[in-house]
């Protein structure tokens, strides 16, 4: 039997594809996720959905905003999503980096209590807005 290093994890056998990125720390993958999403979506509109989230979620949201991808924040799902939704609604960022996020125009909060139909409509609206925007190429 082959020995396995203690700092490894098995790959999920039901997944068909894996994207391996450089880095040694949690969060190093955040900018790569945004880049891969851009490549996979090609010219189709895409959004990032923030549900709950911890420390790394801030990096994921920042990377999505830098990639000019809208982020739908599900308020009521906990932790980072609730903090970010509260900042969006109050206009009171915690610091300079959150001020950049909340004033970017790419973040949109919706309460989970509004239900599936309202969330689905917001996603459709964000995707329609993206697809009708002029392309960067001209």
Where are these regions (language model features)?
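Acidic/glycine-enriched connector segments
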Residues: 1-120
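Ser/Thr/Pro-rich, acidic low-complexity intrinsically disordered regulatory segments
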Residues: 114, 120-125, 129-133
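Long, low-complexity, intrinsically disordered segments
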Residues: 134-138
